[in-house]
Amino acid sequence: MATPHINAQAGDFAETVLMPGDPLRAKFIAENFLEDVKQVCDVRNMFGYTGTYKGKKVSVMGHGMGIPSCCIYVHELIAEYGVKNVIRVGSCGAVHDDVKLMDVVIGMGASTDSKVNRIRFNNHDFAAIADFGLLETAVGQARELNVPVKVGNVFSADLFYSPEADLFDKMEKLGILGVDMEAAGIYGVAADLGAKALTILTVSDHIKRGEKLSSEDRQKSFNDMMTVALETAIKL
């Protein structure tokens, strides 16, 4: 039952799929966090894997960069493979003064300059939000693990190299915590298809302060994010 972009078979994916942007990060997660791992897809080198975490079946698959790419994979996973829960695990650039490098940010909502959700909603504004059950579970698991998290609005940008430098000041004023490129699209697809979605991000750089994580610190904060995501996945 392969799709144009996923060559997995029926039953290959768990009901919950963790999705980083980078397919090599998906491979890393599978090899370092899961047991009994099987690679289930590799079209366009967008790798997907299924294994177990603490005895529960969990899948991980890359979604690429940007809303158009992630929407393809999330749509096909939900519509064709019966996936119920999508948890994006990625990085973001902080814009808010209260957010610092290595913080874990959970996207309660996702603003965007993309038009995809307006197209989806007859040119009306759509409030792209996380599923509350996933959000509540993730926050609870973070507290149990003593992983500090910031919960709030993020901004999903179409342009990585944005010409609108003054927009970051407006984002901070409106309480936006950080910038990614996918959350709003994932929330839109999940809502449209009746699935649940959540975005958990690691702050890899601070856009306004020009700060960036070292490779060592990036890995440490990534591990915290992944543990929160996986502990959330097995509670669903």
Swiss-Prot record:
GO biological process: purine nucleoside catabolic process
Molecular-function annotations in GO: purine-nucleoside phosphorylase activity
Organism domain of life: Bacteria
Site (Important for catalytic activity): 218
Binding positions for phosphate per the UniProt entry: 21, 25, 44, 88-91
Signal peptide: none
HAMAP family on file: Pur_nucleosid_phosp
Name of this protein: Purine nucleoside phosphorylase DeoD-type 2
